[in-house]
A protein has these predicted regions:
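A generic membrane alpha-helix/interface feature
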Residues: 27, 63-64, 94, 117, ...
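Conserved catalytic scaffold of divalent metal-dependent phosphoesterases
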Residues: 87-191
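Short glycine- and Lys/Arg-enriched binding-loop motifs that mark or flank ligand-binding interfaces
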Residues: 41, 80, 117, 195, ...
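Conserved histidine-centered catalytic loops in small-molecule metabolism enzymes
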Residues: 9, 239-241
Length: 242
């Protein structure tokens, strides 16, 4: 029985070039290290700091990462991609070209007999009022169609600016306050889920009650944390020793 890995908030493309190169190398090395033990990998939002697909165009700067994801697919590793608040403009590239199943919002299912609920977590906090309005605006289908009319050399820089604005707004919130997330998870526990996994807060965190567990995956900007499930236990792990 192989392992299931859960990763969120890598935000590839956010840092200055030299720092970004080191972080990409770290992330790729991590993916190579787990390829012999992983049955499946869930990317729970914000793998990229920005992602947008036109009909014939994708951002070229992430080629090295995309190549590694293709390698994982070729090795038979099952992969799933949930959108975050920076990479929700997912088209069909990941599914058709890389064999990565994508989802519009959340994922619910069973792994080794346990019921999981996965969601990036953006918009849950009561303080996220402004973001919830922005989220509806950015995801409105007509706005997406209008945006695709822009040439990529104009549209992509503009979208990166919007992505940066979203990050600045999120950074102003109290990131270590998990009360709203715990309350959300408790409702899912009542629905019968054993594990609730989210990201977005950039703080690794675990809450347990009555044999059920809520986990926030942290990030790959400061914590380099991820979740791993071995069929018996769900735990937080770190790519770098703390």
């Amino acid at each position: 029985m192989g392992l299931t890995f859960f990763i969120s908030d890598v935000h590839l493309g956010e840092l200055p070039p030299k720092k970004e190169k080191k972080r990409v190398e770290l992330f790729v090395n991590f993916l190579r290290e787990i390829e012999n033990s992983a049955d499946r990998i869930f990317f729970v939002g914000d793998l990229f700091d920005f992602w947008f697909e036109y009909k014939y165009v994708i951002p070229k700067k992430h080629f090295y990462i995309l190549l590694q994801l293709s390698r994982l697919h070729d090795r038979g590793i099952e992969m799933h991609y949930l959108p975050g608040n920076h990479d929700f403009w997912l088209g069909d590239f990941f599914d058709h070209e890389l064999g990565i199943k994508t989802y519009p919002e959340d994922w619910q299912g069973e792994i080794d007999g346990k019921k999981f609920y996965l969601f990036h977590g953006d918009g849950i906090a009561r303080k996220d009022v402004g973001y919830r309005f922005l989220r509806r605006l950015l995801r409105f289908p007509l706005n997406l169609r209008l945006f695709r009319w822009l040439h990529p050399d104009i549209g992509i820089p503009f979208a990166r600016f919007v992505s940066g604005s979203s990050r600045q707004y999120t950074n102003q919130l109290k990131l270590n306050d998990h009360k709203d997330y715990i309350a959300f998870a408790q409702k899912k526990f009542e629905e019968g889920y054993d594990y609730v996994i989210m990201g977005h807060r950039h703080r690794p965190f675990v809450h347990e009650e009555n044999g059920r567990k809520y986990m926030n995956l942290g990030d790959w900007l400061e914590n380099f944390s991820y979740g791993v499930f071995d069929g018996q236990e769900l735990r937080i792990a770190y790519a770098l020793k703390k």
